[in-house]
């Protein structure tokens, strides 16, 4: 299932409440402010702080 980019208008980083950006290559939502990447599973963003991966470790 593909990620619906319209969700970017309503979702926010659970840590800083800032905007998230979609990275199509890695299928992740990126918070540049916190340098965190959130996975997308079956088209659903997993916006849990404990599932976030630091950008320097994100694949």
Curated annotation (Swiss-Prot):
UniProt cross-references to Pfam families, sorted A to Z: Trm112p (PF03966)
Transmembrane segments: none
SUPFAM superfamilies: Trm112p-like
Top-level taxon: Bacteria
Cellular component GO terms held in the UniProt record: cytosol
The family this protein is said to belong to: Belongs to the UPF0434 family.
Protein name stated in the entry: UPF0434 protein Shewana3_2582
């Amino acid at each position: 299932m593909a990620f619906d980019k319209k969700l970017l208008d309503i979702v926010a980083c659970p840590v800083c409440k800032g905007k998230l950006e979609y990275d199509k290559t890695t299928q992740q939502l990126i918070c540049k402010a916190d340098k965190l990447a959130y996975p997308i599973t079956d088209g659903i963003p997993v916006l849990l702080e404990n599932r976030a991966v630091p950008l320097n470790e994100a694949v």
